[in-house]
From Swiss-Prot:
GO terms for biological process: cell division; proteolysis involved in protein catabolic process. The keyword Zinc applies. The gene is clpX. Belongs to the ClpX chaperone family. InterPro entries: AAA+_ATPase, ATP-dep_Clp_protease_ClpX, ATPase_AAA_core, Clp_ATPase_C, Clp_protease_ATP-bd_su_ClpX, ClpX_bact, P-loop_NTPase, Znf_CppX_C4. This is ATP-dependent Clp protease ATP-binding subunit ClpX. Keywords: ATP-binding, Chaperone, Metal-binding, Nucleotide-binding, Zinc. It holds the Pfam family zf-C4_ClpX. Residues 3-56 form the ClpX-type ZB domain. Zn(2+) binds at C15, C18, C37, C40. Component of the ClpX-ClpP complex. Forms a hexameric ring that, in the presence of ATP, binds to fourteen ClpP subunits assembled into a disk-like structure with a central cavity, resembling the structure of eukaryotic proteasomes. SUPFAM superfamilies: Glucocorticoid receptor-like (DNA-binding domain), P-loop containing nucleoside triphosphate hydrolases. NCBIfam families: clpX, PRK05342.1.
Length: 421
C-alpha cells in the first residue's frame, strides 16, 4: 500500500497495481497489505477471457463419443434415430480428425466429411445442427442458401457466411476455424436446367460453385466489420479447411426422382411393385443415391463435397405429441411457464394434444408448425389473462383446437366450491 505523506492526504489509499488513488477510481478492494481498483480488476478479467478463448478449443482430448453425442441429441430432438447416429459418428470423427492433425508425426492425412441433411419441412434438420454445436461448444452460424449469389452480383456474398461465424466466435479466428456452419435450403440453389445455358445462373449453379471453395478449404478474406469489400480495408484471414459444413433442405420432388429410378427395376413377373402412396416422403429418402441428387440439379462436385448423407423421416402423430410434451424445452412446457408467471396453471387434455398434432400433419409443416397452432389457440386467453385476477387454471381441450371455442378458464371461487363439494 502506498500513501501520500503530505497534509490531509496522509490516509489516502492507492491501488498497488496502477497507483491511482481511491478518489480516482470507483472502488478500491483491500487485501492483506495490498489494494486493487475496479479498473485493474476489469483489465485482469479481459486478459483471462482472452486466454480462455485462445485455449478453449486447443485440447487434444475430450471429444465426446458418438454415443454421448446421440444421448444429448435425444434430449432435444425426438425420433430420427438413424440420422442421429449418422450425425454423431460424423461429428465425432470430424473433431477427432482435427486433434489427429495437431499431433506431430502423423503421415496419414484424414479428409474432411461435410454432411447433407435431407428431410421434409419441420422434421428437425436445423435443430439437430444447432444442438450439435451446443454439445461441442463451438461457434455456430446459419445461412439461407436462397439469399446467396456469386461474388459481384446483387445479393449476399458466400464469404459473409464466414463473417457470421467469426462474429459468433467474437472475432477469435482460432475458434472460428473449428466451428460449424449450417446452410439451409440448399435444394433451392440447384441448376435451373440440366442443359448448359448461355445466361449465367448466379443464384443456382453459380452459388454451388462459390460454396465449393469454402467447403473444400480455402483462406477467406473477411472484412472485420462486415459490409462490401474495398481495397483500403484490412481483412481477417480465415482458413475454412477445418470448418464443418452441414447442408440441409426439404428437396421437394426428390422422392419422385427416387421412385422413378426404382420403377426401372420393378419390371417382369415376380417383381416387387409398390404403390406410390405406400411410402411417405421420408421413407422414400432411405433409398437415396448420389445420382438422384445430380438429377435434382446439384452439380457433381458439390455432391462430392458432402460425402455423409443423413435422411430424416416424416414425423407421425405420436412423434409430434412427444415433441410437444417431452423434450427439455418442449412447447407445452414453455407455455406452462408463461402462464405460471401469471400465477395460472395451464393444462392440455390428451385429445387436445392429438388434435394439435393432426392439424400440423394436415398443414404439412411438421414440428415447425406446432408453435403457430398453439399461438392461435391461446392468443385470446393470453390477451385477457393479465387483467383477470381470479383465474387459477386454463384447460385446452379438443374443442379449443378444432373449433372456435376458447380454452376453459377455472376461477378461484369455482375451484373452492368444487373442493368443498
Amino acid at each position: 500500500m502506498a500513501t501520500n505523506s503530505s497534509g490531509d492526504s496522509k490516509n489516502t489509499l492507492y491501488c498497488s497495481f496502477c497507483g491511482k488513488s481511491q478518489h480516482e477510481v470507483r472502488k478500491l478492494i483491500a487485501g492483506p497489505t495490498v489494494f486493487i481498483c475496479d479498473e485493474c480488476v476489469e483489465l485482469c478479467m479481459d486478459i483471462i477471457r482472452e486466454e480462455t478463448k485462445a485455449s478453449g478449443m486447443k485440447a487434444t482430448d475430450g471429444v465426446p463419443t458418438p454415443k454421448d453425442i446421440c444421448e444429448v441429441l435425444d434430449d432435444y430432438v425426438i425420433g430420427q434415430a438413424t440420422a442421429k447416429r449418422v450425425l454423431s459418428v460424423a461429428v465425432h470423427n470430424h473433431y477427432k480428425r482435427l486433434n489427429h492433425a495437431q499431433k506431430a508425426g502423423n503421415d496419414i492425412e484424414l479428409s474432411k466429411s461435410n454432411i447433407l441433411l435431407i428431410g421434409p419441412t419441420g422434421c428437425g434438420k436445423t435443430l439437430l445442427a444447432q444442438t450439435l454445436a451446443r454439445i461441442l461448444d463451438v461457434p455456430f452460424t446459419m445461412a439461407d442458401a436462397t439469399t446467396l449469389t456469386e461474388a459481384g452480383y446483387v445479393g449476399e456474398d458466400v464469404e459473409n457466411i464466414i463473417l457470421k461465424l467469426l462474429q459468433a466466435s467474437e472475432y477469435n479466428v482460432e475458434r472460428a476455424q473449428r466451428g460449424i456452419v449450417y446452410i439451409d435450403e440448399v435444394d433451392k440453389i440447384t441448376r435451373k436446367s440440366e442443359n448448359p445455358s448461355i445466361t449465367r445462373d448466379v443464384s443456382g449453379e453459380g452459388v454451388q460453385q462459390a460454396l465449393l471453395k469454402l467447403m473444400e478449404g480455402t483462406v477467406a478474406s473477411v472484412p472485420p466489420q462486415g459490409g462490401r469489400k474495398h481495397p483500403q480495408q484490412e481483412f481477417l484471414q480465415v482458413d475454412t479447411t477445418n470448418i464443418l459444413f452441414i447442408c440441409g433442405g426439404a428437396f421437394a420432388g426428390l422422392d419422385k426422382i427416387i421412385k422413378q429410378r426404382g420403377k426401372g427395376s420393378a419390371m417382369g413377373f415376380g417383381a416387387d411393385v409398390r404403390e406410390e402412396s405406400d411410402a411417405g416422403v421420408g421413407e422414400t429418402f432411405r433409398d437415396l443415391e448420389p445420382e438422384d441428387l445430380l438429377k435434382f440439379g446439384l452439380i457433381p462436385e458439390f455432391v462430392g463435397r458432402l460425402p455423409v448423407l443423413a435422411t430424416l423421416e416424416d414425423l407421425d402423430e405420436d412423434a409430434l405429441i412427444t415433441i410437444l410434451t417431452k423434450p427439455k424445452n418442449a412447447l407445452v412446457k414453455q407455455y406452462q411457464r408463461l402462464f405460471e408467471l401469471e400465477d395460472t396453471e395451464l393444462d392440455f387434455t390428451d385429445e387436445a394434444l392429438s388434435a394439435i398434432a393432426k392439424k400440423a400433419i394436415e398443414r404439412k409443416t411438421g414440428a415447425r408448425g406446432l408453435r403457430s397452432i398453439l399461438e392461435d389457440i391461446l392468443l385470446d386467453t393470453m390477451f385477457e389473462l393479465p387483467g383477470m385476477e381470479s383465474v387459477t387454471k386454463v384447460v385446452v381441450n379438443e374443442e379449443a383446437v378444432c373449433s372456435e371455442a376458447q380454452p376453459l378458464m377455472i376461477h378461484a371461487d369455482e375451484k373452492e366450491s368444487a373442493t368443498a363439494g
